[in-house]
Each structure stands twice: as C-alpha cells, then as structure tokens.
C-alpha cells in the first residue's frame, strides 16, 4: 500500500523536476531570454544608407519650393474671364461685377454683420437639429426672425 501511494508522489516530483529543467536550463524552452535580449541590443549598428543627392542639395531644392497663393479673381485665368463674360451677358455691368466680387471677398472679414452666416447658423430656431447654443434660444418663437 505504501508503494502505491508513493508512486504518484514520485511521478509528480519527477514531472516537476523535468519542468524546472526545461524552463531554467541554459536554453530553456525558448532560450535564455536575458541572453537573447542582450544579443539583440549589441547587434550590428546599421550603416548609413547611401543616397543619390547630398543633404544640403536636397534641402536647398526643397527650400526653394513655395506654393503660389491662389487668387480666385485673377483676371488672367481663362475661367475667370469666362465668368466675367457670363456675368456681363446676364445683364450686369462692370461696376456691378466689381461690387459683387468685393462683397464675396470681404464677406467674412467683418464679424458684426447680423445677417451673415454666424447668426444664421447659431440662432436658427426652426432647424431640425435644434439650436446650437441653449443660451441663444428664444423660447416660444415659432418663426425664424433672421429671415426677415
């Protein structure tokens, strides 16, 4: 009876010893992790890659690139000339064209225009999504007074 009860204990002890030997051995299951980490750290230093152009030449080339400012109403552009001709064909004169161009170019520069985009966006009581700011909501208003 004593031999049968000792057999599982010996098997368990042998299994534990085998597991310790596998895990703590010099190469273990996946090798010595510390040794591998140190080898990876001491790996060969990557050499500097060869490029076709010197760094100064590349910087000089890239520094010279400047994006041209886009001028919407540049009269030399063919599409602007076409818009201008269409505008005159619709019956507007050149002064009216200049006034409209100035209006659209300067539209957002003055922030105090009551009928501008700001109040249309923020004080629209009839908007489906509701007012953008609760403080600006006029309670009980069933019409949007900004449209008048």
UniProtKB/Swiss-Prot annotation:
Residues of the propeptide: 32-70, 133-148
Tissue: Expressed in the intermediate lobe of pituitary, glomerular layer of adrenal cortex, choroid plexus and atrioventricular node of the heart. Expressed in the brain with high expression in the choroid plexus and the epithelial lining of the central canal and expression in the gray matter of the spinal cord (at protein level).
A single GO BP: anaphase-promoting complex-dependent catabolic process
One cellular component (GO) term of this entry: dense core granule
Function: Probable hormone that may attenuate cell proliferation and induce senescence of oligodendrocyte and neural precursor cells in the central nervous system. ECRG4-induced senescence is characterized by G1 arrest, RB1 dephosphorylation and accelerated CCND1 and CCND3 proteasomal degradation.
Family statement: Belongs to the augurin family.
UniProt name for this protein: Augurin
């Amino acid at each position: 009876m004593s031999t049968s009860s000792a057999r599982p204990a010996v098997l368990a002890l042998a299994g534990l010893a085998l597991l310790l030997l596998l895990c703590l051995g010099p190469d273990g299951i996946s090798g010595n992790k510390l040794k591998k980490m140190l080898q990876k750290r001491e790996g060969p230093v990557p050499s500097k890659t060869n490029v076709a152009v010197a760094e100064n030449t590349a910087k000089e080339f890239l520094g010279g690139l400047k994006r041209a400012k886009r001028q919407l109403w540049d009269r030399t552009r063919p599409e602007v000339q076409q818009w201008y001709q269409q505008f005159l064909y619709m019956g507007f004169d050149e002064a009216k064209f200049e006034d409209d161009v100035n209006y659209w170019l300067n539209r957002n520069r003055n922030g105090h225009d009551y009928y501008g985009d700001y109040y249309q966006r923020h004080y629209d009581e009839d908007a489906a999504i509701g007012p953008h700011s609760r403080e600006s909501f006029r309670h009980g208003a069933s019409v949007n007074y900004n449209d008048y």
